Swiss-Prot record:
Assigned keywords, A-Z: Alkaloid metabolism, Cytoplasm, NADP, Oxidoreductase
Signal peptide stretch: none
Impact upon substituting residue 119 to F: Lost oxidase activity and strongly reduced reductase activity
Presence of keyword GTP-binding: no
GO MF annotation list: codeinone reductase (NADPH) activity; oxidoreductase activity
Entry protein name: NADPH-dependent codeinone reductase 1-3
Organism per entry: Papaver somniferum
Active site: 56, 119
Length: 321
């Protein structure tokens, strides 16, 4: 347990990761002083794990916040932090992986990442990040060569560990068939309204840590949902336990053996989100949550194409498997 009360999880590679991280996706203040100050405040109140990505366009502000936190003495060294970033799909080609990671390091003003993840199980034609992806740019990913390049990034010391995001059991099997270094993390949507039971069991059997995103329904994202925050079941449990709905949702994820990333720029909620580790949901609480109707919030529509590797959401998520 760290001094901020956040437990440390030992990944299969042996490195330790804070169980709770601050997400940096879909902020409304990208690249602004406010965004940097929010990251700085998060460090001040106790966050030590930050989850970013090339596609989030938040790496530079996070890097500035880390540098300022060091200058202010909020942290004594970069080693106190756990920094995750992600490989964007347009760079998911064997010869572009290392340059993409090095670009993320330049943005972050860091010498190494703690964790580097493949953002999606699909590639795009090489080029700059764009919000509207042309359908003819969507390509199948060569898991073997892209993962080998990820392994090289770890071997060279530019990242301490490697993993994936949004991979189904089937896609993990394909990737691991050619892997020399197995992925240590699979970051996916997981919440009381999307339990991911089969995927959790598969990842546990293969020593892959699930990191949950959209734990509160990604309500600030264009595809977000109020299903978690408006859940009557979660509200009833929260009132009975003297907690917030957000805390109940986050605690449920943690009690499933998963780590999680959440995002808030509100100092009060930042502090509240850290307070989920000194209490437990009861067996009765867990039983009620198990009965909540299930639905996916995140959409892969922007990566679907009649000529691409995945034509439907079902194919992308392998939900019929």
């Amino acid at each position: 347990m760290e001094s901020n009360g956040v437990p440390m999880i030992t990944l299969s590679s042996g490195i330790r990761m804070p169980a709770l991280g601050m997400g940096t996706a879909e902020t409304m203040v990208k690249g602004t002083e406010r965004e940097k100050l929010a990251f700085l405040k998060a460090i001040e109140v106790g966050y030590r794990h930050f989850d970013t990505a090339a596609a989030y366009q938040s790496e530079e502000c996070l890097g500035e916040a880390i540098a300022e936190a060091l200058q202010l003495g909020l942290i004594k060294s970069r080693d106190e932090l756990f920094i995750t970033s992600k490989l964007w799909c347009a760079d998911a080609h064997a010869d572009l992986v290392l340059p993409a990671l090095q670009n993320s390091l330049r943005n972050l003003k860091l010498d190494y990442l703690d964790l580097y993840l493949i953002h999606h199980p699909v590639s795009l034609k090489p080029g700059k990040f764009v919000n509207e992806i042309p359908k003819d740019h969507i390509l199948p990913m060569d898991y073997k060569s892209v993962w080998a390049a990820m392994e090289e990034c770890q071997t060279l010391g530019f990242t301490r560990a490697i993993g994936v995001c949004n991979f189904s059991c089937k896609k993990l099997q394909e990737l691991m068939a050619a892997a020399k270094i197995p992925p240590v993390v699979n970051q996916v949507e997981m919440s009381p309204t999307l339990h991911q039971k089969n995927l959790r069991e598969y990842c546990k059997a293969n020593n892959i840590m699930i990191t949950a995103h959209s734990v509160l329904g990604a309500i600030c994202a264009p595809w977000g949902s109020n299903a978690v925050m408006d859940s009557k079941v979660l509200h009833q449990i929260a009132v009975a336990r003297g907690k917030s709905v957000a805390q109940v949702s986050m605690r449920w994820v943690y009690q499933q053996g998963a780590s999680l990333v959440v995002k808030s720029f509100n100092e009060g909620r930042m502090k509240e989100n850290l307070k989920i580790f000194d209490w437990e949901l009861t067996a009765e609480n867990m039983e009620k949550i198990s009965e909540i109707p299930q639905s996916r919030t995140s959409s892969a529509d922007f990566l679907l194409s009649p000529t691409g590797p995945f034509k439907t959401e079902e194919e992308f998520w392998d939900e019929k498997d």
